[in-house]
UniProtKB/Swiss-Prot annotation:
InterPro entries registered for this protein in UniProt: Cytidylate_kin, Cytidylate_kinase_dom, P-loop_NTPase
Kinase among keywords: yes
Documented EC number(s): 2.7.4.25
Origin superkingdom: Bacteria
Binding site for ATP: G10, P11, S12, A13, S14, G15, K16, G17, T18
Statement: the UniProt record of this protein carries the keyword Protein biosynthesis: no
UniProt protein name: Cytidylate kinase
Entry GO CC: cytosol
GO molecular function, one term: CMP kinase activity
Organism, as annotated: Chromobacterium violaceum (strain ATCC 12472 / DSM 30191 / JCM 1249 / CCUG 213 / NBRC 12614 / NCIMB 9131 / NCTC 9757 / MK)
Gene3D superfamilies, per database record: P-loop containing nucleotide triphosphate hydrolases
Keywords tagged on the record: ATP-binding, Cytoplasm, Kinase, Nucleotide-binding, Transferase
Family note: Belongs to the cytidylate kinase family. Type 1 subfamily.
Amino acid sequence: MTVPVITIDGPSASGKGTVAAQVAARLAFHYLDSGSLYRLLALHARRRGIAWDDEPALARAAAALPVEFSDGAVWLEGNDASQDIRAEEIGIGASKVGALPAVRAALLQRQRDFCEAPGLVTDGRDMGSVVFPDATLKIFLTASAEERASRRHKQLIGKGESANLAQIMQDIIDRDARDAARPVAPLRQEPDAFLLDTTELTIDQAVDKVLEWFEEKQASGH
């Protein structure tokens, strides 16, 4: 039996991770936050003294990355790294290492290994285009740059961190440009992906829409 896969791709701070995690919970499917793999690699490299542009060393590290997802947390070398990988600096590093072809190739099979029964919901930049091209349902989830910057700003302030809205906005614009321009797996909406703009939607509304589309796909036998 083919394991159903829902891919949710989109730009930074679009809310795709929150939506994907809730869809997975509602369906009792496995969940893969692919972006966390790149964040973990950036963090691992920083701790190991590997530069974020050292492609051969990063590819070797990616192939042997000691990572585990369990109990709602992300573990690196046996330690909970869930908070460490969310630092803004590590997010920028993840975008840089993720632009390297050898790194993406090294992490490709590791991501596919998460596809197990009863199903998988995964989010990232190239889940529907590269990692799971035959996914049951592909979503391209986005929101305006202004809305994404506002959400990220509120998130950081809520954590008690200092945050500059203008700087966050610029970082998002820069990351969008980097993601769209990279030579391997550039961020783009696939022709067979449903577009979900969450600028004016709540999280619950976005989750409900994904579930509605999934039910339609299942009913049509695709």
